[in-house]
Amino acid sequence: MQPRNDTSLFKGNCFDILPTLPSSSVQLFLCDLPYGVLNKQNPHAAWDKPVNLNALWKEMKRIGTPNCAYVFFASGLFTHDVIESNRKDFKYTLVWDKKATTGFLNAKKQPLRRHEDIVVFYAKQCKYHPQFTKGTPSHIRGANATGKGNHNYGNYNPEITMKYTDDKYPTSILCFEKNKHVLKHPTEKPVSILEWLVNTYTDDGDTVCDPTMGSGSCGEACLNLNRKFVGIEMDEIWYDYAVNRLEYRTEETKSNGSTKLSGEENGN
């Protein structure tokens, strides 16, 4: 799939950058904000400061299209905070099963942890493309061990029910293995789950915005799927890393089309 020629990266605070973006220009906000749950005494966790969600919603609602989807990674109390920040538009949560456990130091006090939440909002029905998976064929309604049908659910047409395939609709549990390699960013998400979300809530050529992009994983997912990407990062080290990462990914896809990677600095 040929990549679009619109990948825009901005260095600066998202509250300085977002007001400069045009209204009704984004179809999906895919947010992996700081959860604000790490040890405040740890100097390496200084970046984990809560974002002003009310101020963020004000800008996102202006920039998003009427049927824009707003998707947040979250966990623990931060999940509650995210939902409470916009109860009106909250629709549902997904559970990301990371297939990797943490919390061994507290294993005798509480269950090991292997999931994070994904919180979905929209004001008007957003685009939704179910990502089907293969499974065993569905049980045909009315069949029983004797081979004779039953009428527990009323009459039905066997010719119609026999048309069911082994394609399965997605559930609220998403199983994507957490990256096992040395993480580029301390809260980096697998490109695979980001691609799943981008495919689910956008069309080819739509625009996705990540207001705190970190190492640029969301941008890579968008490049892979022919989506336009707007990424914002205030940390200079991670911004530079994301630029280099996406430029490298762009070079890999040049044989399939031209990709333009633009970067801007806010001066903060």
For the regions a protein language model found, what residue spans apply to each?
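Conserved SAM-binding loop
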Residues: A242-V243
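Core catalytic lobe of class I
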Residues: M1-I232, I237-Y239, N268
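Positively charged, low-complexity nucleic-acid-binding target-recognition regions
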Residues: M1-D6, L246-N268
